[in-house]
Amino acid sequence: MIKGRYEDENLKWIPLLIGLVILIPFALKGMTFSYKYYLYILNTVGVYIILTVGLDLLSGYTGLISLGHAAFMAIGAYSSAILVDQVGLPFMASLIVSPIIAGLFGFLVGFPALRVSGMYLGLTTMGFGFIIRRLIIAMREWTQGSGGLVVSAPEIFGFTIKGDWANYFLVWTVALLVIVAVRRIVKSKIGRAFMAIRDSEQAAEASGINLAKYKMLSFFISGVLAGLAGVLMAHTNHFISTDHFDSMLSIYFIIMVLVGGAGTVYGAVLGTVFIVLLDNLFVPELE
């Protein structure tokens, strides 16, 4: 509880950072250089934040390592692309169904967490990522294999979300809602159970916490959020392929969480903003 108060007192400025990120495109539009690339980067930041706050819930708050979150993202992305463009499901329905599908896979992957931990669990989740990648390639009739899949623009209440600005506000609206939702989870009984498991499984079990239930729940929620990020990535980028979801991306996500500070929702946000901007804006300038 002391740690929670410490986070609240020292991270109050992070919402201001989020506000600045949202307002930046308006400043960019008035400049002489093309702002579309920068808007694309900010869209990427928003999508990744949805995933990393979920990963932080799993790794930072529950203490379970995952090196396969790119796979959950791929499941959400491909599920939505297939459901919307091939099955005919409305985008708003897919926005709910596809993340749940990813969450169910997360639930299944969570079973090893009942028996193994640490890097053994990390390697297990990484292996899951390889399996999903091969499965996507094998399901060529639905996924077009390694060639990639063209994805339609999202349609909400009869309005097609097209263009950089529309995509931007869709992504960031969802991202902010996810941040608020995860903060509420962290401060709830569920969040306290997650942190108790992270701090000491033996003590948590002795206090009456069902370890299996909460570990599986953590994997499920984290998988749902990764799948949600995948849905938005697919329908705003309009193209997905297996190259977008390789194992290095999962490690990339872990780095974001660690840089911002594992076990803090806003830390995951800050780490994501920092790493994506560093990778896309500053590193290319040094090459």
Residue ranges and their predicted role:
Residues 1-287:
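Transmembrane alpha-helices and adjacent helix-loop boundaries
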